[in-house]
């Protein structure tokens, strides 16, 4: 199980863990809300290949949980961001595989935790685990493609937050049949999504080196537009970080990205958000777009002031 509004890294790493369970002859499923996921094209690829029976709605898994059930959480460590709080509360044994910076509100009772903040993605960590498994029962090309998509998402196609281990994982996945061209297709969007993304980028303004864009509620199924627009805003000269806020169900969803000059996780943590240095998000409840904008700007002010103080102290 991954986080709410699961992305390609959450789903890709979950698919990798599912393969490990199968290698060990342990029955397992992936709990995922297919209506809210940002990895819809990946799910469709598995469904079209006849491999979709392992993706189960969270509510449907509750009746099969026993005292011996092991919950493996990927791509998040925060309890409030889990795909299903009910599954977490019902499972007595929990394993966490994550690469995000540890903060308040993390899962505090794991049986085992594999936490590496310097890894590019949860998919990279799962790749390393898979390489210890028997080669004769290893992953399929489709599973390798899912893991490669997770790495490509969190590294922005190997542009940021990559290390030697990242490229080693990608090379191993390529040797297992992952096709980069097919993987790239998972990032394609519809014409409507592209237009919504362009509208958000057009509405942005620059505040203290940060691009801020606000949007009223998007059509159903367009959640993927937020992180894409945030990434697009980083290509503007002089922009160190981007924040895209979109109204949703009486609240506001925020997607933030940076090139490394600002730590967007630190900026969004006071708003209840999480993530890591260059990629973070937050969900504000009972909040208007204007309130969200004010709170984002306040946190940018605080962060920039702290940066200035550190620079003065270093002189």
Summary of predicted features, one role per range:
Residues 1-5, 10-52, 62-69, 148, ...:
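Hydrophobic helix-and-loop "lid/oligomerization" segment in the mid-to-C-terminal part
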Residues 55-109:
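Active-site cofactor/cluster-binding pocket
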Residues 3-4, 74-77, 97-100, 129, ...:
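Fold-independent oxyanion-binding glycine-rich loops
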Residues 99-170:
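Short alpha-helices
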Residues 12-13, 41-44, 84-86, 106-109, ...:
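Short acidic, glycine/serine/threonine-rich loops at helix termini
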Residues 92, 124-141, 245-259, 304-306:
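A short, flexible low-complexity segment enriched in Lys/Arg and Gly/Pro that occurs
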Residues 17-18, 88-91, 112-113, 169:
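Glycine-rich, phosphate-binding/catalytic loops in enzymes
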């Amino acid at each position: 199980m991954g986080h709410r509004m699961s992305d390609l890294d959450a789903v890709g790493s979950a698919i990798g863990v599912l393969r490990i369970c199968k290698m060990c002859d342990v029955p397992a499923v992936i709990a995922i809300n297919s209506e809210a996921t940002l990895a819809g094209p990946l799910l469709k690829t598995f469904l079209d290949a006849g491999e979709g029976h392992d993706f189960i709605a969270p509510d449907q898994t509750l009746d099969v949980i026993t005292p011996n059930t092991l919950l493996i959480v990927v791509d998040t460590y925060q309890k409030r961001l889990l795909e299903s709080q009910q599954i977490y509360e019902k499972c007595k044994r929990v394993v966490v595989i994550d690469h995000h910076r540890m903060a308040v509100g993390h899962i505090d009772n794991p049986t085992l935790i594999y936490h590496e903040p310097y890894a590019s993605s949860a998919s990279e960590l799962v790749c390393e685990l898979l390489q210890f498994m028997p080669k004769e029962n290893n992953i399929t090309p489709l599973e390798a493609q899912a893991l490669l998509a997770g790495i490509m998402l969190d590294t922005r196609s190997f542009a940021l937050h990559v290390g030697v281990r990242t490229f080693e994982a990608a090379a191993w996945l390529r040797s297992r049949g992952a096709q980069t061209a097919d993987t790239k297709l998972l990032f394609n969007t519809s014409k409507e999504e592209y237009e919504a993304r362009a509208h958000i980028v057009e509405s942005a303004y620059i505040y203290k080196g940060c691009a801020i864009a606000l949007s009223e509620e998007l059509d159903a199924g367009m959640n993927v537009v937020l992180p894409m627009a945030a990434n697009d805003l980083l290509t503007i000269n002089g922009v160190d970080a981007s924040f895209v806020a979109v109204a949703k169900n009486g609240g506001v969803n925020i997607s933030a990205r940076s090139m490394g000059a600002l730590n967007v996780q630190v900026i969004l943590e006071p708003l209840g958000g999480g993530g890591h240095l260059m990629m973070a998000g937050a969900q504000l409840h009972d909040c208007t777009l204007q309130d969200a904008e004010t709170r984002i700007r306040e946190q940018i002010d605080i962060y920039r002031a702290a940066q200035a103080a550190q620079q003065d102290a270093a002189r």
